[in-house]
């Protein structure tokens, strides 16, 4: 029964992976084509492209981890494959979260309306410093992940290679507890960008509320371009927050799996939930971006035209 459940979850994970690759590859392709055409890239497109690339890598690592757990559990647990997968998963995970946070920060500074001197200074300079912020996120992720992942894998390898039968169970329990605590630490580090995103969300709500009040007092209505921009930004940020919470819960499931009998099943179930975040958020970003939305509608119209043309040819035959 467990094997059937694992296989079912694996096939569902493949479906989520395919959807996520489709959405993120579309974002990256549209922005890169626009970059080549105009020979420059807007700040928002740079953030979205970086986010899409990091999520494509994250999806590939998660799916590879699922395959290794189901098909080659012994090789995965004892070889350096686990070390490599854990490192790249943690790295791409942190990059994806930090880039999504950069997107929330960018929305906040470009759309919100406050009159504090520091806010106005940052609003004026955000386009100039966003590339450096993205680079800083990459460097920070590498420096956090390298030592933590090495400790994580060293603890687990000691558990796997333990050969003293009298102390084997106790040794594994201790090292697995250390392994889980290291993973928990890596997950807690992601609470920093989550908190930044949460602050941006509440400040955007405050800015929207103040803007609507001004519109009502001036009797000009509430559905002006600034209000629409606020609403679109809030939808993108709140979707990230909800999906990130589900993503974080999936890591807690995977971490707690070391203390329950069906470890592999719990890990695969956690990874199945984890795939929802990078897969679905890309389509929310596409719908919230005018250029990406127009490009997606154009692609859908082209596909529909091709399908209708084939049906017409088949009827003639």
From Swiss-Prot:
Gene3D superfamilies linked: Rhodopsin 7-helix transmembrane proteins
Assigned keywords, A-Z: G-protein coupled receptor, Glycoprotein, Membrane, Receptor, Sensory transduction, Taste, Transducer, Transmembrane, Transmembrane helix
Entry's localization field: Membrane
UniProt feature coiled coil, ranges: none
UniProt keyword Transmembrane helix, yes or no: yes
Cytoplasmic face residues: 31-55, 116-128, 209-235, 288-317
Highest taxon in the source lineage: Eukaryota
Matching Pfam families: TAS2R
CDD domains per record: 7tm_TAS2R7-like
GO terms, molecular function: bitter taste receptor activity; G protein-coupled receptor activity
Listed InterPro entries: GPCR_Rhodpsn_7TM, TAS2R
TM annotation in the entry: 10-30, 56-76, 95-115, 129-149, 188-208, 236-256, 267-287
Membrane topology: Multi-pass membrane protein
Residues exposed to the Extracellular side: 1-9, 77-94, 150-187, 257-266
Glycan-modified residues: 167
Cellular component terms per the entry's GO annotation: plasma membrane
Protein family (similarity comment): Belongs to the G-protein coupled receptor T2R family.
Function: Gustducin-coupled receptor implicated in the perception of bitter compounds in the oral cavity and the gastrointestinal tract. Signals through PLCB2 and the calcium-regulated cation channel TRPM5.
Additional observations: Several bitter taste receptors are expressed in a single taste receptor cell.
UniProt name for this protein: Taste receptor type 2 member 7
Species per Swiss-Prot/TrEMBL record: Papio hamadryas
């Amino acid at each position: 029964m467990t094997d059937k459940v694992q296989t079912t979850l694996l096939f569902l994970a493949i479906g989520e992976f395919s959807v996520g690759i489709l959405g993120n590859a579309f974002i990256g392709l549209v922005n890169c084509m626009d970059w080549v055409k105009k020979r420059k890239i807007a700040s928002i497109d740079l953030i979205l492209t970086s986010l899409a690339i990091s999520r494509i890598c994250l999806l590939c690592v998660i799916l590879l981890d699922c395959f290794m757990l189901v098909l080659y559990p012994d090789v995965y647990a004892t070889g350096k494959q686990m070390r490599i997968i854990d490192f790249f998963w943690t790295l791409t995970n942190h990059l994806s979260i930090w880039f999504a946070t950069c997107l929330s920060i960018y929305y906040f500074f470009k759309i919100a309306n406050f009159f504090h001197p520091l806010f106005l200074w940052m609003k004026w300079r955000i386009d100039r410093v966003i590339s450096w912020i993205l680079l800083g996120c990459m460097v920070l992720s590498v420096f956090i992940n390298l030592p933590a992942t090495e400790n994580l894998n060293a603890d687990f390898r000691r558990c796997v290679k333990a050969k003293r039968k009298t102390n084997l169970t106790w040794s594994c329990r201790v090292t697995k507890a250390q392994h889980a605590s290291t993973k928990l630490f890596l997950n807690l580090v992601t609470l920093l960008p989550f908190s930044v995103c949460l602050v941006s969300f509440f400040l955007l709500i405050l800015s929207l509320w103040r803007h609507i009040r001004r519109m009502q007092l001036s009797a000009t209505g509430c559905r002006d371009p600034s209000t629409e921009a606020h609403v679109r930004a809030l939808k993108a940020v709140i979707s990230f927050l909800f999906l990130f919470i589900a993503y974080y819960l999936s890591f807690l499931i995977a971490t707690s799996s070391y203390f329950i009998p069906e470890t592999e099943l719990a890990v695969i179930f956690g990874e199945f939930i984890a795939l929802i975040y990078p897969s679905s958020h890309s389509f929310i970003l596409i719908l919230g971006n005018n250029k990406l939305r127009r490009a997606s509608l154009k692609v859908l119209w082209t596909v529909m035209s091709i399908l209708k043309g084939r049906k017409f040819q088949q009827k003639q035959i």
